[in-house]
Amino acid sequence: MLRRKILAFTSAVAACAAFFCLPAAAADFTCPYFSLPLTGDWAQQRMQPGSVPPNTFATLFASRKAGEGVLITVIPSDKAPKEAAQIMANNYKQQGMRVLGNPVQIPGQNAYRFTYVSTNNKMHAIVFISGKGKHLANVSILGRHGTGGLALLKGLTSKEDKLFPKF
């Protein structure tokens, strides 16, 4: 089940590669899982219908100025973040992505991160996997450097204890 959701999520990432072409108005974003102040030119993007599996929450934010996107996905799962991160890294490898090392634990947190580069070397991503029992959060920063996405995520406030890592 998790493998299917991760594959569907990966397909959603690929479908979102053109995220800079779908502008939406900038404003603070809030949902059942988190709130996030959208600073600068960061804006929520529309997700393609059918790109997100049932019972999964996903939203994409993009900044033309930073040349980056942030994809946040929350799925119901009781898998440990370590196991989920390894499954996801293996799935990216099977799809031909170049995963740079194994997922590593973020010090002092039940959260893991890894990076990958697309097969054509045009898309770089930093992936964070975290959760606490009933949900897993996957936060992917898409773009060359990741600094703009990390700066945006510093403002994220989780509504579920330890669902997201501290950025």
Residue ranges and their predicted role:
Residues 26-54, 106, 159-167:
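N-terminal "mature-domain start" segment
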Residues 33, 78-82, 143-150:
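Soluble non-cytosolic domains of exported or imported proteins
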